[in-house]
């Protein structure tokens, strides 16, 4: 043990003296180590790890095994190859059946041909993406860190010999490539040794498809290839191509049998369990991926009415128990005019795209949405009764640069069955949709009824007191104390805003009283709230006279009165979370779409169609105004709408003559009216907040019964957090809403001022201060700087 350090020092001293010599060369080092092997032994034992030594031994053994015997070489030099063809066939079949890589298999066969032709080396090329370029194949482990297919250049003449052969598909034997002007770049290889003689052969399948190029070469000074070498190489490649084709045909037949078995299996699955249609679609998509060896799969259905493609089932690229996972998420839609899927849906043609981003038809929106990168696509239409009802899209071939013709043919047959499955799915969806409509309708009819003749006749003869006629013009007017007059207040507002002859009075009274009947007795979203919202819209229209058309004024006032029809006191998220039939009917803006549906239902009742005097085009217009206005009360849509309006206002691009801009402004007006309780006098605002939270807490109580913890806003156990919650609501929602509205419609500034006053009151509540406030006396919504004041206490 003590001799170790001195021996090591001696070893390294001798090595150091050797390596520091100014005339040191590789030959001198090798010569020195040959004469002093103990130095190498000492150096390796002390400085080289056991893993490295093991790697050297493995490489040496592999090299020895790779070198064939003269007898074995002679077998492959027989151009008839009867002695090895069956062995070759068996070898290829075994490799392919066990999932062997075609590229690696051809590389191994090329190595045999190199030995048989006594070449110094070879290069194997395969076609790149789009089949217009070549890539050099590098087997794994040969050069660590390098890809298996390295781009070598385009397929064209006037560059390299491999590109020339790929272009012409003819074998070339060149004795001296350096002197051949057809190949200015020679072989294009960097072998470290000058190449002189080259034998370059195309690798062609039995059906004539080019799959690669084999380039054999000999170094400078060696004997050039001759015709016999060409014959040996050609014979070997020909037999290899036939063998590969034969095995692939057998595999295709096996695949066909597997496909037939699968179709029978899916048929049984469908008829045994028709309810689980999503499971059926997943089953189909999983097999489609395996059929063409794709990385991702997507199935889009066609909405011919709106000319859109849509999907809610996505391949997220994960696996569970060896099977792909498909996730059902929020539905995405895009125009049928966009993308490769849209092209297939429009034309009904199959598209095989080897390079997606190089194709101008490719729609990158889906990649941006999912964060996935699409390289190549195989897209197939699903046709039923002569019409494209869906599109199946395979994305990114896993093994190979692109989807092949075989993939395309197999997929065509598979798409026929997809059409049957999708047709059945659509039929089942329509049945389910009808069942949901029926259940909701029966529930509604069991609760609601049409107004009596006494109710609407009493309204026809009602006259509003003069004092209320004055106060109704104020933005902060409170209808609360006048419950029996609410229907009459709405009739008055209609006549003041639209004229006394705008509707038949009898139909108008029937309509109003039936709308009242269809509001449920919930704490907040009730008949009182409907009239309050309608009054705020009335005040906005009156203070912006001449800005809106007669149809818009009629439609907006009716929309406000009906905007919460048949509200159950539960939020959209609650209905969707617990699979309420309404959520099945309307996937987005659930309650808002139901409110509009109820509005149309009342209009269709006998004697209730207040728009019956309009022309058909005007009738469609006013219904669309009402629909858009009611949908706009979905607070989830408000944030994006207000942001767009703010940007347009700041940039000066807002144009009220532009219909889309006008729709956005009306949407903001509807939100402002829906939230108008925050613009009333403080006592009214405070009482309304109590009603709102009573409804929230009732929903929270229901969630607790089901074992779900509600959000703090809906938890009555956290009522102490109400003032702080209101502060956040005012700052995040109400103040921005009325600020943007005031910018666009300046006469609505009193709404913003009142909202800020109430924000101050909530801040006082948080600080524990008195919340009495001074307000203006009887006045209009204009300046009140010289009006008498009065004190209002909570």
From Swiss-Prot:
Reactions catalysed: a nucleoside 3',5'-cyclic phosphate + H2O = a nucleoside 5'-phosphate + H(+); 3',5'-cyclic AMP + H2O = AMP + H(+); 3',5'-cyclic GMP + H2O = GMP + H(+)
Database matches in PROSITE patterns: PDEASE_I_1, PDEASE_I_2
Cofactor binding, note field: Binds 2 divalent metal cations per subunit. Site 1 may preferentially bind zinc ions, while site 2 has a preference for magnesium and/or manganese ions.
Predominant cellular place of this UniProt entry's protein: cytoplasm
InterPro entries according to UniProt: GAF, GAF-like_dom_sf, HD/PDEase_dom, PDEase, PDEase_catalytic_dom, PDEase_catalytic_dom_sf, PDEase_CS
Chain segments annotated as transmembrane: none
Keywords assigned: Allosteric enzyme, cAMP, cAMP-binding, cGMP, cGMP-binding, Cytoplasm, Hydrolase, Metal-binding, Nucleotide-binding, Repeat
One GO cellular component, as annotated: perikaryon
Keyword Repeat found: yes
Top-level division of the source organism's lineage: Eukaryota
Pathway per the UniProt entry: Purine metabolism; 3',5'-cyclic AMP degradation; AMP from 3',5'-cyclic AMP: step 1/1; Purine metabolism; 3',5'-cyclic GMP degradation; GMP from 3',5'-cyclic GMP: step 1/1
Listed EC numbers: 3.1.4.17
GO biological process: cAMP catabolic process; cAMP-mediated signaling; cGMP catabolic process; negative regulation of cGMP-mediated signaling; regulation of adenylate cyclase-activating G protein-coupled receptor signaling pathway; regulation of cAMP/PKA signal transduction
Domain comment, as recorded: The tandem GAF domains bind cAMP, and regulate enzyme activity. The binding of cAMP stimulates enzyme activity. Composed of a C-terminal catalytic domain containing two divalent metal sites and an N-terminal regulatory domain which contains one cyclic nucleotide-binding region.
Oligomer and partners: Homodimer.
Name of the protein described by the UniProt record: cAMP and cAMP-inhibited cGMP 3',5'-cyclic phosphodiesterase 10A
């Amino acid at each position: 043990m003590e001799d170790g350090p001195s021996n090591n020092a001696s070893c390294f001293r001798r090595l150091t003296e050797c390596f520091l010599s100014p005339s040191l060369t590789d030959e001198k080092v090798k010569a020195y180590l040959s004469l002093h092997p103990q130095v190498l032994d000492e150096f390796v034992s002390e400085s080289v790890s056991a893993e490295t030594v093991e790697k050297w031994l493995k490489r040496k053994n592999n090299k020895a095994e790779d070198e064939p015997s003269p007898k074995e070489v002679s077998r492959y030099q027989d151009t008839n190859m009867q002695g090895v063809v069956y062995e070759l066939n068996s070898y290829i079949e075994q490799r392919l059946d066990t999932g062997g890589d075609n590229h690696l298999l051809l590389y191994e066969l090329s190595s045999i041909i190199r030995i048989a032709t006594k070449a110094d080396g070879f290069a194997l090329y395969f076609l790149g993406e789009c089949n217009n370029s070549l890539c050099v194949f590098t087997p794994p482990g040969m050069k660590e860190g390098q890809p298996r297919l390295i781009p070598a250049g385009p397929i064209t003449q006037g560059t390299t010999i491999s590109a020339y052969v790929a272009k012409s598909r003819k074998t070339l034997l060149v004795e001296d490539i350096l002197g051949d002007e057809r190949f200015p770049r020679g072989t294009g290889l960097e072998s470290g040794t000058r190449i002189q003689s080259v034998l370059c052969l195309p690798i062609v399948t039995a059906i004539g498809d080019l799959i690669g190029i084999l380039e054999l070469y000999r170094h400078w000074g060696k004997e050039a290839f001759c015709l016999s070498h060409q014959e040996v190489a050609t014979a070997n490649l020909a037999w290899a191509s036939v063998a590969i084709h034969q095995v692939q045909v057998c595999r295709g037949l096996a695949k066909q049998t597997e496909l037939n078995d699968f179709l029978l299996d899916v048929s049984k699955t469908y008829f045994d369990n028709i309810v689980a249609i999503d499971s059926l679609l997943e089953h189909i998509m999983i097999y489609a991926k395996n059929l063409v060896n794709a990385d991702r799969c997507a199935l889009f259905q066609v909405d011919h009415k709106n000319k859109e493609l849509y999907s809610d089932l996505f391949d997220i690229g994960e696996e569970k128990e060896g099977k792909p996972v498909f996730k059902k998420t929020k539905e995405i839609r895009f125009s049928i005019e966009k993308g490769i899927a849209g092209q297939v849906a429009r034309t009904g043609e199959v598209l095989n795209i080897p390079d997606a981003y190089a194709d101008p038809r490719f729609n990158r929106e889906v990649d941006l949405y999912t964060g996935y990168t699409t390289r190549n696509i195989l897209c197939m239409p699903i046709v039923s009764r002569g019409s494209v009802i869906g599109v199946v899209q395979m994305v990114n071939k896993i093994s190979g640069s692109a989807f092949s013709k075989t993939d395309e043919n197999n997929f065509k047959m598979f798409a026929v069955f997809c059409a049957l499955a999708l047709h059945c799915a659509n039929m089942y969806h329509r049945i389910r949709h009808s069942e949901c409509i029926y259940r909701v309708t029966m529930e509604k009819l069991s609760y609601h009824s049409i107004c009596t003749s006494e109710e609407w006749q009493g309204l026809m003869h009602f006259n509003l007191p003069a004092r209320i006629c004055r106060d109704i013009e104020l933005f902060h007017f409170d209808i609360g104390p006048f419950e029996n007059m609410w229907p009459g207040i709405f009739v008055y507002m209609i006549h003041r805003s639209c004229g006394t002859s705008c509707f038949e009075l009898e139909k108008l009274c029937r309509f109003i009283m039936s709308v009242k009947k269809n509001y449920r007795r919930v704490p907040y979203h009730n008949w009182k709230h409907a009239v309050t919202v309608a009054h705020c819209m009335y005040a906005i229209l009156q203070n912006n006279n001449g800005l809106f058309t007669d149809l818009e004024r009629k439609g907006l006032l009716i929309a406000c009165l009906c905007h919460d029809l048949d509200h159950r006191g539960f939020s959209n998220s609650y209905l969707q979370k617990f699979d309420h039939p309404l959520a099945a009917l309307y996937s987005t803006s659930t309650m808002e779409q139901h409110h509009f549906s109820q509005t149309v239902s009342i209009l269709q009742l006998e004697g209730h169609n207040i728009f019956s005097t309009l022309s058909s085009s005007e009738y469609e217009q006013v219904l669309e105004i009402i629909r858009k206005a009611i949908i706009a009360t979905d607070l989830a849509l408000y944030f994006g709408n207000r942001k767009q309006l703010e940007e347009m206002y700041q940039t000066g691009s807002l144009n009220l003559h532009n219909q889309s801009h006008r729709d956005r402004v009306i949407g903001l007006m509807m939100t402002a009216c829906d939230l108008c309780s925050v613009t009333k006098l403080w006592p009214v605002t405070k009482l309304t907040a109590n009603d709102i939270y009573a409804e929230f807490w009732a929903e929270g109580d229901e969630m607790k019964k089901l074992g779900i913890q509600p959000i703090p806003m809906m938890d009555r156990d956290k009522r102490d957090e109400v003032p702080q919650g209101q502060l956040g609501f005012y700052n995040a929602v109400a103040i921005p809403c009325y600020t943007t509205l005031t910018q666009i419609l300046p006469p609505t500034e009193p709404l913003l001022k009142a909202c800020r006053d109430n924000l101050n009151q909530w801040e006082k509540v948080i600080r524990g201060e008195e919340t009495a406030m001074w307000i203006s006396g009887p006045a209009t919504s204009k300046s009140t700087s010289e009006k008498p004041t009065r004190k209002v206490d909570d």
